[in-house]
Structures are given as structure tokens and as C-alpha cells.
Amino acid sequence: MSEIVVSKFGGTSVADFDAMNRSADIVLSDANVRLVVLSASAGITNLLVALAEGLEPGERFEKLDAIRNIQFAILERLRYPNVIREEIERLLENITVLAEAAALATSPALTDELVSHGELMSTLLFVEILRERDVQAQWFDVRKVMRTNDRFGRAEPDIAALAELAALQLLPRLNEGLVITQGFIGSENKGRTTTLGRGGSDYTAALLAEALHASRVDIWTDVPGIYTTDPRVVSAAKRIDEIAFAEAAEMATFGAKVLHPATLLPAVRSDIPVFVGSSKDPRAGGTLVCNKTENPPLFRALALRRNQTLLTLHSLNMLHSRGFLAEVFGILARHNISVDLITTSEVSVALTLDTTGSTSTGDTLLTQSLLMELSALCRVEVEEGLALVALIGNDLSKACGVGKEVFGVLEPFNIRMICYGASSHNLCFLVPGEDAEQVVQKLHSNLFE
């Protein structure tokens, strides 16, 4: 069999009939594209998440109508809509029943079952668009191969099981024609639907590419590649034509939203290049993320992540003692929380948490039970409304004058916390949320323009 390219299209790329057709054009322009991974149509997942929270009848019917209208606007423009009308109606009926159940009692498992319907509908519609072009396209339920644990809302894939199941059930289908499947969703051992967390469709594409030994992953979104920073914050931001895995991973981890942070893990493990382009203008080019690049610059990009919380833990018991940090991290681990940045002194430790939420519902990670456990160990201070700015580069810790070049620009601003030296690829600092955009703009102007 020839090489395999996995193409993933985000919500805006399958938002309506015209967007789906543009995405179909991209798929058909490359004969090596054998597997297509889709998100739900834009807006659908947010509507489903709202339903999963349990709504009063009036609000519930309003959301259900909005979902129907988005999907039927695509369905009715098909030449032969009746071919899949019954299947779409069945999924909409499922959504209605599950939304009624959520109004009585919510649960993470119910939420995952409900929100999975967005991807199920978008993939059915996309397959029919391809078939009306006389393309041999198959719909495939990714839950047959994407085995995960039962941590609903933020499930973790079983890599070994995925590889085995993909070889048995997915690979043979790629020999028969184009396969269309869902991002974001999976299933646990008992067959219950799980999700990989918001933005997990990119991760799905990379995981499937790894399992199928693909030659490349294409991520099609609404921007033509990865930029030196968010163009909505800095209009002078420049596209990066080629970037190394390590640099892109730092950018994704610290807030650049073009790629889901976990996307690059399978790509790095299996050395699979990732291309990022715009489905609205595929000829505009994009960014290739690969193992290494020639002559990487000292400063590569700036990433911004809002809604950060700083926890400062004070305890005199830290003084000349052992095991305090182990206890703190044990508590955080029990609450499934990972720490971003950390600084310590003799009697205190400060650490940052990304509290925007990374479950399918977007719930905050900073719960009362977590704070109570920490308070039993030490005095806890919580500061919210902060933003994390990360300067991404190469060998930053070995270069002379980086501190002067960066912090000279930041003199007018209050810097709440700095992390530097643990990685040669980043210099991170925490600033008040209201200053974040100005900080990024000034740094970009001085370092990149």
C-alpha cells in the first residue's frame, strides 16, 4: 500500500455545506490522504455541552433547535438528503433523550455520551458529500479502535490497544478507499463513550497516524500555519514556515491554540511530520512541524495563556525538612492536576495552574476539596486573573544577554513570577491578565520585528 496521510479538519472547516466542500476539495487533491478525522461542526460542541449541564425545558428546546438547524442546513443542500436523513434524525433523537436525562441528573459519563454526537453527525454528512462526488468513502466509528481509560471528560488513550485494534479494523479499510472518522471521542473497556478533552481531535489524528505508521498528519484549521504569536494580538505576527517538534510543543503547551498540546506526543514518538494549514485558503501554504530545522533562531515565538491561577503555599515546616513538596504533589496528583510552573523558597512554594478547564465540560480544576486538602498542610494563597507569557526559543539558557533583552522591555509591568533555566526552549513569566496583550506586543516589537 502507498504512504498514508491523515488529514484532520476542525470545526470551522466543517461548519457548513460550503466549508465541507472546500475540505473535500483538499482531501481529494492529495491521493495519499487515506484517513480523514473530523471535529463537530462549529458551535455544535458548545451547544451539546450546555445541554449536558442540565437545562430547563425552554432553554433545552432552544439548544436542540439550534443543533438541528446547523446540521439540517448542510443536509438539505445534498442532492440526495434522504440517504442519511433517517440516521441524522436518529442521532438528534438520541441527543434529545440524553439532554432530558441530564436535566434530571448530570454525570461526566452522560456528558461524554452526549457531546460525542457532534462528531458522529459531521462525519456522516461529510461522507455523503464525498459519495455525491462519486468518491469511494467509508464512515468508520473511531470508538472501535480508540480505547481509553474511564476518566470521562479527559480520557487517556491505551496506545498498545489502539495499535492492535487499528491494525485489525482500520488498516484493511484503507485499502478499500477513503475512510472518514471522528476526532475527540473514544470508548472505555465496557464500551461507554469517552472524550479526550476539548480540542482532542488533533490528538486523535496524531494517535491514529502513529498507529497506522502514517507518513504525515495534516491539521486543517482557520489559520494558515503557526505564527510568531497570535495575529489577533499582534497584527505584525509572521508565519513560521518550518518549526521543530520541541519548539511547537512548547508553543502548544504554553497557549498557542493552533495545535492541541498533546498532538505532538505521538508525532515526536514516531517522527511523523505535522503540517498546519488553512482550509479556507489551502494555497496560502502553512507550517511544517518536523524533527529538526536548520539554523533555528534564538527567539522563535511568543505564547500567551490567559486565566491562570497562582497558588502560594506557606509553611514553616518546609524549613530544613524533607517531603513537603512530595506531599503537595501527592495531593495534586489525587485531584488529577499537573503543575505548569513552580518556584520555591525556604518556607514557601508558588505554583501555577491552568484553570480554564480541560475536561469536556470546561469545569475548573481548582475545587474546594483540593483547597481544603492543601489548607490542612499549609497556608494557601490564591491569586486569579493572571496570564502566562512564554518566550519560546533555542538554547536560551546558554545565550548571553537574554535577561537584559527581555526584561528591559518589561520594566513598566509587574512580573508576578519568573521561570527560566529548566528548559532551554522557554522563558516564562506570570503577569496581570489586563497587561498580557501589551506585554506580548512590546516583546514582539523588540524581539521579532
Curated annotation (Swiss-Prot):
Annotated gene: lysC
Other facts noted in the record for this chain: Aspartokinases I and II also catalyze the same reaction(s).
Name this protein carries in UniProt: Lysine-sensitive aspartokinase 3
A Gene Ontology molecular function term of the record: protein homodimerization activity
Impact noted for substituting R198K: Increases KM for aspartate about 200-fold
Subunit structure: Homodimer. In the inactive form a homotetramer is formed.
Aspartokinase as annotated region, ranges: 2-245
Catalytic reactions on record: L-aspartate + ATP = 4-phospho-L-aspartate + ADP
NCBIfam families according to UniProt: asp_kin_monofn, asp_kinases, PRK09084.1
Residues reported in the UniProt entry to bind ATP: K8, F9, G10, G11, T221, D222, Y227, R232, K257, V258
Binding site for L-lysine: M318, S321, F324, L325, S338, V339, D340, S345, E346
EC numbers on record: 2.7.2.4
Broad EC category: transferase
Species, as recorded: Escherichia coli (strain K12)
Recorded GO CC terms: cytosol
GO BP terms in the entry: homoserine biosynthetic process; lysine biosynthetic process via diaminopimelate
Highest taxon listed in the record's lineage: Bacteria
Name of a matching Pfam family: AA_kinase
Span list, region Interface: 246-449
